[in-house]
């Protein structure tokens, strides 16, 4: 029953309307996605596959989470959804912890991102798995090429790399190095991993993790997108005449009936 309630609360957070939240850009992004048929369809698919928590060995976890299926649905969302809307959900700016927690939960971290253990593994583990993966390796290389500062410089970023940096960062979601927001008090992002247990390879481990946690090019690209988000959403949704909340209430009610 506890897992059902957890899944129900997550569903409300993911698909909830502005009546449950104070106005903020993450709510605006969610409503814009709901008003777009393609975005809403793909979003509903990943929500349905990502409820619950991950379990060891790829087995279905509490609430029905199968991480491989969840991550596949997330890759479809970013590959096939309107980029202006998918990126608005991913990079919406927040000023308070409630907004930041909504943003952190948007892509179902309990299934797609963290665990199944309580302690994150060494970053060398997902990095090595990514380097052996035909799916993950080219995406990570693209992220490094488009988002990493130039060698020997902390601040010199690839020319005109902002939009491409965001695109290739989003391409990592749904891979073995899926990044997410780490908490609800900052905008720090990283894969689910650390470097405390990396032994004599700690420097290599930290270099990988800092691609996310201390990357001025990625931070700058996210901040630039946030400054443009209102006009981006206005352009994307111009002319839409969808009801603001009827889709949300109907979908949420049906899903809750199935869970309870």
UniProtKB/Swiss-Prot annotation:
Residues with lipid group (GPI-anchor amidated threonine): 237
Alphabetical GO biological process terms: cell surface receptor protein tyrosine kinase signaling pathway; glial cell-derived neurotrophic factor receptor signaling pathway; negative regulation of ossification; ossification
Expression across tissues: Expressed in many tissues including adrenal medulla, brain neurons, with highest levels in the cerebral cortex and hippocampus. Moderate levels found in the gut circular muscle and myenteric ganglia as well as in other peripheral ganglia, including the sensory dorsal root and trigeminal as well as superior cervical and sympathetic chain ganglia. Isoform a1, isoform a2, isoform b1 and isoform b2 are exclusively found in the thyroid, parthyroid and pituitary glands.
Keywords assigned: Cell membrane, Glycoprotein, GPI-anchor, Lipoprotein, Membrane, Receptor, Secreted, Signal
InterPro entries from the UniProt entry: GDNF/GAS1, GDNF_alpha, GDNF_rcpt
Pro-peptide region(s): 238-260
Gene3D superfamilies membership: GDNF binding domain (1.10.220.110)
Domain of life: Eukaryota
Subunit note: Interacts with ARTN ligand and RET: forms a 2:2:2 ternary complex composed of ARTN ligand, GFRA3 and RET receptor. Interacts with SORL1.
Record function comment: Receptor for persephin (PSPN), a growth factor that exhibits neurotrophic activity on mesencephalic dopaminergic and motor neurons. Acts by binding to its coreceptor, GFRA4, leading to autophosphorylation and activation of the RET receptor. May be important in C-cell development and, in the postnatal development of the adrenal medulla.
The family this protein is said to belong to: Belongs to the GDNFR family.
Protein name, entry field: GDNF family receptor alpha-4
Origin species: Mus musculus
Organism placement in taxonomy: Eukaryota, Metazoa, Chordata, Craniata, Vertebrata
Gene: Gfra4
